A protein has these predicted regions:
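C-terminal edge-of-domain segments
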Residues: 81-95, 101, 109-110, 115, ...
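Catalytic cofactor-binding cores of redox enzymes
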Residues: 115-120, 124-133, 273-301, 306-320, ...
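Long, hydrophobic/aromatic-enriched structural stretches that serve as scaffold segments
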Residues: 218-240, 252-298
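Short, hydrophobic/aliphatic alpha-helical segments
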Residues: 261-277, 428-441, 459
């Protein structure tokens, strides 16, 4: 056990004291609101009750509860203690219904076995579980295993850590898949595959992109798990003595993990090509989103320090992805199409963006938000299509250079910048005209599409952090 975890050990008396205090807080809230309470905390075996991944999972449970009970929450209380973080929600609904919904949350998530969501009726009594908890290790009734001490504390610690790491890896791979699907269905996207047409591509369509997404998603989960396994030496996150890039000779990951990530990326490409019949739909996205997924998982595990409220997720994930990108070798004498274009035109493209922490993805995310605010959510074009223009106006897109040469790439930038300047006055007809022109010229800005997917991923990660801020405004 790390020195940090030893310092965070919680004793039996501390837990008992917290239980008494919690019961008093519950009775006080019941007296003030007269509504059933949904009480959320984590069920963690052993003396260490806090950790970056534990807190990450807690906020997953809280987000789920906030979404299910949306519009019915009349009060909210939050506790941040060494014994664990907790939340109480006063909900305007029948206690029996709330209990069923609480149990559905525990079943929905892979780490739901660690959620402890109690419902207290207006009579002050806790509603019983319909199905007893199962043991984390053997699947037998948890109460029986606890009484007989069937499993050691170390076994339970390892099982908990593995469950949390797998949950984080799976979650961020799902966000990556959502981002890819949202990107391909953003319409219109000049020169690119969308719901209208195949853009300047005659070998792919939206349906093929969906097949490709399904094929590569499992590899995003594998990448995140590789990164987490490499650095989560403590029970539930980074070890207490983790010191950033200095820990592994200038890289945020050890060389072995970097090598495994490269091999997983190659396997993802092979799976993509098998699914698409040899068509390159997502090679660039495997690179950019692979970095983003790993960065998001490492951030959840406390890579930048233990930040349980996870504010400014997009910026932090993008910055961490940039640090990860520095660990990879990008040989400029490679024979790939991208390397040839980089050498010919002296541009960095996606690699340069990755090492810089995806600045254009952050710009696109901001443009998407600004457009929705300025148009009051009633804009004449898809806000992500508008955001794409911000990427196209700035990115040294290897695909555009390959297909249109320097003159074609300059045309893309100029037209995109002009349309971007129209802000909410931009019309769909203008985007369609741009689309027609790029199709006529045979220019497809695949690098911009990959960057848009990264922006959508960062936006999805950011949205998850807003629930707590909204709940905090809820008072009795």
């Amino acid at each position: 056990m790390s020195r940090e975890n030893q310092m965070n050990n919680v004793g039996v008396f501390e837990m008992a004291e917290r239980r008494e205090k919690r019961a008093a807080e519950q009775q006080d809230m019941l007296a003030r609101c007269g509504l059933p309470l949904v009480c959320i905390n984590m069920n963690i075996a052993g003396p260490v009750k806090r950790g970056a991944l534990i807190d990450w999972a807690f906020f997953r449970a809280l987000n789920a509860a906030a979404n299910i009970f949306k519009g019915k929450i009349r009060g909210f209380a939050f506790t941040d203690e060494k014994t664990g973080i907790e939340a109480m929600l006063a909900v305007d609904a029948a206690a029996e219904s709330l209990k069923k919904q609480a149990e559905s949350i525990e079943k929905e998530f892979p780490e739901g076995r660690l959620f402890d969501i109690d419902v207290i009726g207006t009579d002050g009594l806790k509603l019983s579980r319909n199905v007893p908890r199962k043991c984390l290790i053997c699947g037998q009734p948890a109460a029986a295993c606890a009484r007989s001490r069937t499993h050691s504390a170390e076994e339970l610690r390892k099982a908990t850590a593995e469950l949390l790491k797998n949950a984080a890896a799976q979650h961020y791979s799902e966000l990556a898949a959502q981002a890819l699907i949202r990107e391909v269905h953003t319409t219109p996207k000049p020169g690119l595959v969308d719901e209208n047409n195949s853009g300047a591509n005659d070998d792919m369509d939206a349906a093929l992109f969906e097949l490709s997404t399904e094929a590569v998603q499992p590899f995003f989960a594998q990448m995140a798990k590789i990164a987490l396994d490499a650095v989560c030496t403590a029970a539930f996150g980074f070890s207490g003595d983790f010191s950033g890039s200095a820990a592994f000779g200038g890289s945020i990951l050890p060389n072995g993990a970097v090598s495994c990530l490269k091999q997983t990326g190659i396997l993802a490409e092979k799976a993509m090509l098998t699914a698409t019949g040899g068509v390159n739909t997502h090679r660039g996205a495997i690179f950019s989103l692979g970095l983003a997924v790993c960065a998001a998982a490492l951030s959840a595990a406390g890579a930048e320090g233990h930040l349980p409220l996870r504010e400014n997720a997009a910026e932090r994930i993008a910055k961490l992805a940039g640090k990860l990108a520095e660990a990879f070798d990008y040989e400029r004498n490679s024979g790939s199409n991208g390397a040839i274009v980089r050498r010919k035109y002296g541009v960095g493209g996606a690699i340069e963006q990755a090492k810089a922490g995806f600045p254009l993805a952050i710009v696109a995310k901001s443009l998407h938000e600004e457009y929705n605010i300025e148009s009051n959510g009633q804009g004449s074009v898809d806000s992500w299509a508008f955001a794409l223009l911000g990427i196209m106006a700035e990115l040294e897109d290897n695909n555009a250079l390959k297909r249109g040469g320097d003159a074609g790439a300059r045309f893309v930038k100029r037209r995109a910048a002009f349309l971007l300047s129209k802000r909410t006055m931009l019309t769909e007809a203008e985007l369609l005209d741009f689309d027609d022109e790029l199709i006529r010229r045979g220019i497809s800005c695949g690098g911009a599409a990959d960057m848009l997917a990264a922006a959508i991923f960062l936006s999805l990660a950011d949205e998850e952090q807003r629930v707590f801020a909204e709940l905090s405004k809820t008072t009795l």
